[in-house]
UniProtKB/Swiss-Prot annotation:
Catalyzes the reversible conversion of 2-phosphoglycerate (2-PG) into phosphoenolpyruvate (PEP). It is essential for the degradation of carbohydrates via glycolysis. NCBIfam families: eno (TIGR01060). Mg(2+) binds at residues 242, 286, 313. InterPro entries: Enolase, Enolase-like_C_sf, Enolase-like_N, Enolase_C, Enolase_CS, Enolase_N. The active site is at residues 205, 338. The keyword Nucleus does not apply. Its cofactor is Mg(2+). (2R)-2-phosphoglycerate binds at residues 163, 338, 367-368, 389. It is found in: Cytoplasm; Secreted; Cell surface. GO terms for biological process: glycolytic process. This is Enolase 1.
Length: 428
């Protein structure tokens, strides 16, 4: 039997959940097998992310991706024809070399990632395996999920500076049972917000976007909703935040402008401590300091690493070199993993391996601009990612990922393990 090789790589411009253009890629093998992938994009982006190539000009507000599409259909297609789709490192290395820039700025990370993901999907189909099994083998775990149910910052047009308020099931049950708890709290939260007099319109990630006065009010609403849904805060359902501090950090004065206050590093830590003391079910914070505020992040890590999970997003941008730097500096204790921040499946896996090797937890993440693509659901299971965040249990581009996880759990059977919150974080 002849070994299948890549016969054709084709891309087209489609649209994401925010109505912005993005890239869809089809990789066709010599035996007719086709793998497909759709690339997400972020609203809150780190300075060191791989370059998402946009066309500029007047068409579609300058956000068109036809240049990236054309790069796939010409240069990348020509370079990958005849290559083995099962050799993911070689596929990705070929595209990186072809691009020739340190940030994938010539061909576009959105072009390269689409091909990288679609190739993995084609290879899995060629092996007659689901993607999670092809990438991950046999020793698999279902991830613990984090759900952004109150949106602020860059994800909503309201007065809340902190970007995401998430809930996560910590009771040791099946993924389905945990997700049902989340759905119950989500619907309860809607009523709680209505009773508080707030609008319940949705933000980019399916969470509510009430025009609240401050973050404390958002946390109180979550706390009340958990209880009213019949659960115990911290025991059944916990809370996590993505602070996205780079978006309220002022580069001119080197301080944090948060909720009408101007705070130093130390004062910001005091602000966080107040929230942690008032809401002990708050167990994880992402990007509590600006991505360039190394001193602030390191000091916060030193004083809080045994109390909460400190997730690095903009600080490392899923880049193994930046993660290695953060590890040596002593910043954070967990890595947020976004495929489109680095731009290939292979490099993403490298960052995950480096995280694990150094005792950092990993959280696989969606982006605010999503599609119906479910790659990250399979990916989170395949790499035993431990944690996954993909928005609220609302809006189809978010729920698609969770529905895919329900399918995977059904396929794996009840004998498979469920990943829970890391043991090094004390929920008491």
């Amino acid at each position: 039997m002849l070994k299948s090789v890549i016969e054709n790589v084709h891309a087209l411009e489609i649209f994401d959940s925010r109505g912005n253009p993005t890239v869809e890629v089809f990789v066709t093998l010599s035996n007719g097998v086709v793998g497909k992938a759709e690339v997400p994009s972020g609203a809150s982006t780190g300075e060191n992310e791989a370059v998402e190539l946009r066309d500029g000009g007047s068409r579609l507000g300058g956000k068109g991706v036809m240049n990236a599409v054309n790069n796939v259909n010409t240069e990348i297609n020509d370079a990958l024809k005849g290559l083995d789709p099962h050799d993911q490192p070689n596929i990705d290395a070929t595209m990186i070399a072809l691009d020739g820039t340190p940030n994938k700025g010539r061909l576009g990370a959105n072009a390269i990632l689409g091909v990288s993901m679609a190739t993995a999907c084609a290879a899995a189909k060629d092996n007659h395996q689901p993607l999670y099994r092809y990438l991950g083998g046999t020793d698999l775990e279902m991830p613990q999920t984090f759900h952004n149910v109150i949106n602020g910052g860059e994800h909503a047009d309201n007065g809340i500076d902190i970007q995401e308020f998430m809930i996560t099931p910590v009771a040791k049950t099946s993924f389905r049972d945990g997700f049902e708890k989340i759905v119950n709290v989500y619907h309860t939260l809607k009523k709680v917000l209505e009773d508080m007099g707030y609008e319940t319109g949705l933000g980019d990630e399916g969470g509510f976007a009430p025009n609240m006065k401050n973050s404390e009010e958002a946390l109180k609403a979550l706390h009340e909703s958990i209880i009213k849904a019949g659960y115990k805060p911290g025991e059944d359902i916990a809370i996590a935040c993505d602070c996205a501090a780079s978006y309220f950090y002022n580069k001119e004065d080197g301080k944090y402008h948060l909720e009408g206050k101007v705070l130093t590093d130390e004062e910001l830590a005091d602000y966080y401590d107040k929230l942690l003391d008032e809401f002990p079910e708050l167990i994880s914070m992402e990007d509590p300091y600006d991505e360039n505020d190394v001193e602030g992040m390191v000091k916060f890590t030193e004083s809080h690493k045994d109390r909460i999970q400190i997730v690095l997003d903009d600080f490392i941008c899923t880049n193994p070199k930046l993660l290695n730097k953060a590890i040596h500096e002593g910043a954070g204790n967990a890595s947020l993993i976004k495929l489109n921040q680095i731009g290939t499946v292979t490099e993403t896996l490298e960052t995950i391996r480096l995280s694990r090797k150094n005792g950092y937890n990993t959280m696989i993440s969606h982006r605010s601009g999503e599609t119906g693509d479910t790659f990250i659901a399979d990916f989170a299971v395949a790499v035993n990612g431990g944690q996954l965040k993909s928005g609220a249990p609302a809006r189809s581009e978010r729920v698609e990922k969770y529905n895919r996880l329900l399918e995977i759990e059904e396929e794996l059977g009840k004998g498979e393990r469920l990943a829970f919150f890391p043991d090094n974080v004390d929920l008491d």
